[in-house]
Regions:
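Terminal low-complexity segments of carbohydrate-biosynthetic enzymes
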Residues: 1-11, 250-337
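N-proximal low-complexity "stem/linker" segments adjacent to membrane-targeting elements
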Residues: 1-56
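Acceptor/aglycone-binding surface of glycosyltransferases and processive sugar-polymer synthases
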Residues: 98-106, 110, 132-206
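Conserved catalytic loops of nucleotide-sugar-dependent glycosyltransferases that act on lipid-linked
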Residues: 170-265
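Short aromatic/hydrophobic "clamp" motif used to bind/position activated sugar donors
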Residues: 122
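Conserved donor nucleotide-binding strand/loop of the catalytic core
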Residues: 66, 80-108
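Short, acidic, metal-binding catalytic loop of nucleotide-sugar glycosyltransferases
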Residues: 53-65
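A conserved acidic beta->alpha catalytic loop
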Residues: 72-80
Length: 337
């Protein structure tokens, strides 16, 4: 089924209120697909307990979700202990898929967590959300539970920005607005209807997720959006309005690094390095400068400080994990836990 972005926006945009019945029901869920909720977590002891309490209250009333996983980055702040105390299955990201070495960021943690997910439908959510509510869960899962033709649902929301006592209702999501959306409009205009293309909250059918690769770091969300689109097409994708979502804000320097990874991820999917290299095949421009996709994994960030000018070098590796369904090597499969 082919759809224009306008048709898709009208027909595949939902509101969490459309699925309030899921939040109020008390059935045992035997006839519906099973569900797994995964939280990639790093130093979120201050929020993960409250979030899991909300999830457990929903689970006690409705049976949603069937499985709750926290995959922790060996956080020194006690994130894992808090999560266990609130009833979650807790895994160290470095203990899953050990054949691939230490985990290399959020996307890698998500990929590894998928290996222990049992649900027919898998939902991911950020663990640093300050205003997590039950409708985040049933709203995101709802379209997939209601429509067997859908394969992927992305959360949409308003992103407030709070600085001191000042609050700008739509001031958050700076990487989304300044980098991701312009790139999507330029290279993937069919996906321009997604309000939050970088949202960490999304749900998908596990069988489909097992067929897509995962970028290991900040590129995981935009890379997955593109790869799911290539796998199932726009008509099998949807978004749901969750209202307002507030999470911790990053410094501009960190946002700059994130933006560079989003840019390189789209460049990788577009083969942009090959396009920039003038067809030389060596990955270099006529002047010897590497094409965009062949650029080194370091990101140079020049800043002016009170002490003077400084240039910082950051490692921004763009690593891609293979689809789980493609893994047939006994060593890789036996190292799941």
């Amino acid at each position: 089924m082919s759809m224009t972005v306008w048709e898709w926006f009208e027909q595949r945009s939902y509101h969490h209120r459309d699925f309030e019945g899921l939040g109020r029901s008390s059935g045992n869920g035997a006839e519906r697909p099973s569900t797994t909720l995964i939280f990639p977590a790093r130093n979120v002891a201050g929020t993960i307990g409250t979030i899991l309490s909300v999830v457990q209250d929903l689970r006690a009333r409705t049976g949603l979700p069937d499985q709750v996983i926290v995959v922790d980055a060996d956080s020194p702040d006690g994130t894992a202990d808090v999560a266990r105390a609130h009833g979650a299955e807790v895994y160290s990201e470095n203990e899953l898929m050990r054949a691939y070495g230490p985990a290399q960021g959020k996307g890698d943690a998500m990929w590894r967590a998928l290996s222990v997910a049992r649900g027919d439908i898998v939902m991911f959510a950020d663990a640093d959300t300050a205003d997590f509510e039950q409708h985040f869960v049933y709203g995101t899962l709802g379209p997939l539970l209601a429509d067997p033709q859908l394969q992927f649902v992305k959360a949409a929301f308003r992103r407030p920005f709070k600085q001191g006592e000042d609050k700008i209702l739509d001031g958050g999501g700076r990487v989304t607005e300044l980098m991701a959306k312009p790139l999507v409009n330029l290279f993937y205009p069919e996906l321009a209807g997604f309000v939050q293309p970088l949202a960490g909250e999304f749900a998908a059918r596990r069988e489909m997720l097992s067929r897509v690769p995962f970028f290991t770091g900040y590129g995981v969300e935009i890379g997955m959006l593109i790869d799911v689109f290539d796998q199932v097409g726009l008509a099998a994708m949807a978004q749901v309005d969750l209202g307002t979502r507030q999470n911790r804000h990053q410094s501009l320097a960190n946002l700059s690094r994130m933006s560079s990874v989003v840019l390189r991820t789209v460049a990788a999917r577009e083969g942009l390095g090959q396009r920039l290299d003038g067809g030389l095949g060596s990955g270099a421009l006529d002047n010897g400068v590497p094409g965009l996709w062949e650029q080194p994994d370091t990101y140079l960030h020049a800043v002016a400080t009170e002490e003077g000018l400084r240039i910082d070098e950051h490692l921004n590796e763009l690593i891609e994990r293979p689809p789980l369904a493609s893994l047939t090597d006994d060593t890789a499969l036996s190292s799941i836990v």
